[in-house]
């Protein structure tokens, strides 16, 4: 992962698509990239792992990072759900979603349009990206076509062929 991360950190652009078969560590690589971008004291090889920014990523609480996954996966990996989603699930109004919900994507798009809290820009990590349905993917597409200035996106996928061709074409 370190070699891939170092190579990707040299790239310029606002959207990356990390793809490969299951088990290669796409989420870990995506999170490593995001950590390096948001780190207060990055090294030539990525995030320092010691600063306040790295710490809040470790505890899943960075204000400039939005992680989008199916709710079932977020819960399994210990990532917090948006307040409304958590309230709906707690109140038994619905079960955790098995796909990335369109309202979560719309919230992420709105998130990218706000000012960075720590001055390093905003980052959105989507995993597994193939868990977006067409409506969710289209909610992301406009932002990929006209990205906010300091926002970066990482889409990590085990089945990139299932993504809309227009999504794939907007990513490095």
What do these predicted ranges mean?
Residues 1-135:
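Clamp-loader machinery-focused feature within the broader ASCE/P-loop NTPase space
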Residues 131-132, 146, 162:
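Residues immediately C-terminal
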Residues 110, 142, 169:
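Conserved adenine-binding aromatic site and its adjacent loop/helix in ATP-hydrolyzing domains
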Residues 127-129, 155-160:
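A short beta-strand-to-loop transition that corresponds to the Sensor-1 phosphate-sensing loop
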Residues 166-172:
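A short helix-turn-beta junction within AAA+ P-loop NTPase domains corresponding to the substrate/partner-engaging
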Residues 118-123, 148-154:
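Loop/turn-to-beta-strand initiation segments
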Residues 113, 138-152:
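Conserved catalytic/switch belt of AAA+ P-loop NTPases
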């Amino acid at each position: 992962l370190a070699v891939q991360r170092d190579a990707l950190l040299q790239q310029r652009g606002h959207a990356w698509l990390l793809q490969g078969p299951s088990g290669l560590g796409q989420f870990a690589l995506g999170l490593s990239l995001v950590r390096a971008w948001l780190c207060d004291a990055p090294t030539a090889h990525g995030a320092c792992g010691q600063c306040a920014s790295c710490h809040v990523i470790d505890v899943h609480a960075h204000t400039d990072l939005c992680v989008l996954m199916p709710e079932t996966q977020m819960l399994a990996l210990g990532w917090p759900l948006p307040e409304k989603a958590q309230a709906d699930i707690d109140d038994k109004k619905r079960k955790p979603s098995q796909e990335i919900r369109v309202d979560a994507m719309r919230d992420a798009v709105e998130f990218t349009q706000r000012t960075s809290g720590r001055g390093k820009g905003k980052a959105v990590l989507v995993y597994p990206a193939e868990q977006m349905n067409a409506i969710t993917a289209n909610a992301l597409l406009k932002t990929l076509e006209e990205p906010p200035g300091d926002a970066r996106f990482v889409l990590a996928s085990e089945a990139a062929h299932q993504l809309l061709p227009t999504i794939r074409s907007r990513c490095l």
